[in-house]
Amino acid sequence: EGVGSSEKIKEILDKGVPDLRAGLGARVIDTQIYYAEKLGHFPKCQKYIHIYHPDLQGPFEVAHLIWGPDIYYALHDEPDLVHELLDLVTTTYIAFMKELKKTLNDEEDEFCCQWNTLYKGKSCNKE
């Protein structure tokens, strides 16, 4: 459903990047640390059992979840505000992914693992 109003979005923007360990962020990070620690005791398992990031969705999907369906009207009526929210979400997304990457083992050697598929190369993205 989202916050549903421009005023609430402005309040979110004023707060800036949230604490990555607030809410579910801490749970996700701590769970990955736990998995990495447990696998660390079993080098052979660690080599073949890949821990990779959860599906964080994309910046617009996250912005839509924050704002709600009115974000589609805002694209026309308040494009600058939508752009600011997308900037904040993208900045937060990058910071969170960097934090997660500290405990991931999905891009070791010459392969990466995404959604139970092993790909040759360091990343599935061209970027």
Where does each model-flagged region fall?
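A contiguous, low-structure linker/loop signature
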Residues: 1-11
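Internal, well-ordered domain-core segments that constitute the primary functional module
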Residues: 10-20
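Active-site loop segments of alpha/beta catalytic cores
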Residues: 18-127
